[in-house]
């Protein structure tokens, strides 16, 4: 990740204010990278993220393929497990989740992350979007709000300097 960041910063002349976002497993990746690197990101957003991959079929399959069968090593790459024991700077997080998402209860389970956030006193904004599913239509409907969320956080961080 560090090599890619330096490459992007150099190529696009970025100013060091960064946010991260993703959808589904990419949303999980955004949560994990943000929680593991709080000094790097000013905010995190996700659309319908898998929040506890070590406990759901999609995640178990992916973790076994990428991390091996030793489940103890999975915790470092599971957003919920990271949230449970998080003690760093609390980066603002916004999640959009459609209530008509067919994967909502079996694979995504955002309510688990809500409980973990409460347990670690981490402020988490999760918006359950009525009638929306896992599709790109949902993303296109709410992407502007997520970008505004990031923009506001970037402005807030700039004024703290």
Explain the meaning of each model-derived region.
Residues 1-161:
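Non-catalytic cap/lid and distal C-terminal segments of serine-dependent acyl enzymes
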